[in-house]
């Protein structure tokens, strides 16, 4: 699951130039994966087939002698198993997403988890097999025809092997993880699914009860200042009531992770997430240094937005609040079909292949978008490896957030689609570059909306919508990183109390927003799902990387015109085949450890802020 940050956009029907109005289903097709839901006989057969493949793989690895041919055969089998596990995973997760909170899916997640654990043991043995070859022998093996396409991934596996403990200990750690790190992450889901709050609607004075997920959506999109503030106050109070439970969860999840990292030779809590994102500390430092150096540009923007919203103080809930009353312009909701047509059309301005892909995804029902009760909040894209397809989950309400979410997730899916002819291990791109393609797709759609504005008021609303992404990437995400870095530092010395977690988060928000918020959200550590994800530590800085990296690519796209598409696809196809620094150097000829590239992205934000301030002068 990947829960992605939404940007805001407004689609204008006047921009719809197509003569034929397509009608698309808003429910996805999961039956083409396994028909019949979670009771599908084909799903049951797949469980059995994958289990048998894992058993056979384990037998083969146990008796293997290191050679290029043996490594190639085992790699093929491992990738087949990985594809099967990935396909089962998206299927179960897909059904659980549209029937959120149903405990019937729990046994399936447990069964899937057991398969992953069973696969991990022989995979660790396979990694150690690679170490039995000396450097010269390994290099010769990688040069063979069958291994050449996956040589980068195999090299990473061989490096991983150097950290591994004995097989028995590694097997125990993986088994403990089911009731350790994974269990604590699932426990957080159970806690959050059971939370609700009551708020007062300022327009009619009525008290309304909503879930935690509904509250989060309303905090981003509620136009009434007082109602939004009421929800925020109740939201903070709700998470405060659960702080002992969520603090226990966060502490134990982090404790397991730190112990595991230490056992495997990691010297700091940042070493593993940087390794997972195939980037260096120097690149991370250069990126954050540019973010810090450019925060001041947001201050006049927030001051002007505070005026436009008519607020005495700017609170956490106001950072991406929509502008709904500017001049005589009134944003209108957009139908799903209109949003689809606009996305397809605008993708086509940069890449006909992107447009054709998006059209296919809508037509083949790869997207779950229907607004109905019982769905989990947020959005994600997951690949279906066995079918060489993708599935996209979101809830489309016609609001200013939702069409951009579709574009974002289609960007992810297009990225994955460019790799279907390559081995599965060439599809294992890291989160930081994964967020590049999705954010690039959003930029296309949002800039098209701004260009098509019919008045200054409309353009101002669209620019403000576009600003939600840089606010998230420069400020909100940085607050998460600063908190998590401080928390993991303190957690090494023992459990961190809820009160101290609040203090760390408040300090992180103060620093990240440079004092621009009058009212903060100290229980953000408790309310934000990303802190509780077991599979990915530091689920934050890759977003900022992806945003700024995509800004650089977008600038190149505008320069290259018709020559851009092939260059872009070539970059995407290399995302799992080299480090982030190597990717940037090869395809953009830039050095990510230096500030220049990152500053170019910040300069684009400054341009939007300058235009926002100039346009808004007449409305205050």
Regions found by a protein language model. Give the residues of each.
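Post-HExxH zinc-binding segment in Zn-dependent metallohydrolases
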Residues: 430-458, 466-468, 472, 546
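Long, K/E/R/D-enriched contiguous segments that form extended
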Residues: 313-342, 415, 467, 471-473, ...
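C-terminal, non-catalytic "cap/extension" segments appended to globular domains
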Residues: 4, 126, 130-133, 152-165, ...
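A well-structured
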Residues: 12-329, 614-620
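Catalytic zinc-binding patch centered on the HExxH motif and its immediate surroundings
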Residues: 329-334, 367-388
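Active-site recognition of the HExxH zinc-binding catalytic motif
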Residues: 265, 397-417, 438, 443, ...
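Inter-helical turn/loop segments and adjacent helix faces that build the functional surface
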Residues: 281, 350-353, 417-425, 447-462, ...
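Short pre-active-site segment immediately N-terminal to the catalytic Zn-binding motif
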Residues: 331-334, 387-406
